[in-house]
Amino acid sequence: MARVKKAYKIITFANTTAAMAMESFCLENNLPGRLIPVPQEISSGCGVAWRVPVEDYDLLEVKRSQMNFAWEQVIDLMM
């Protein structure tokens, strides 16, 4: 039986420090998602990305102005 792929937003970062800051920020603010290795389909600076279901992405976008680190890219990907 084949696994059904789901739609995700993949957020990449220029460095691992920003990726770890994203994880801490999301845990402290009870925001969805998790750190993953950057998928092969994507090229990224640090090799670590944040994966969040598409339906939950708006929760992150609302809090983005409170984050003191930068996102590199936001990519839609079926995984």
Language-model features, listed with the residues they occupy:
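Short secondary-structure transition/capping segments
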Residues: 3-4, 46-48
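Short amphipathic alpha-helix segments
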Residues: 15-32
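A short linear hydrophobic-aromatic micro-motif
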Residues: 32-38, 72-73
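Short proline/glycine- and acidic-rich turn/helix-capping motifs at secondary-structure junctions
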Residues: 40-46, 76-79
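Short, flexible, solvent-exposed loop/turn segments with mixed acidic/basic and small polar residues
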Residues: 1-2, 36-41
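Short glycine-/aliphatic-rich beta-strand segments at the starts of folded cytosolic domains
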Residues: 2-12
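C-terminal structural segments of small proteins and small subunits
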Residues: 51-79
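Short aromatic/hydrophobic contact patches that present stacked aromatics
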Residues: 10-12, 47-51
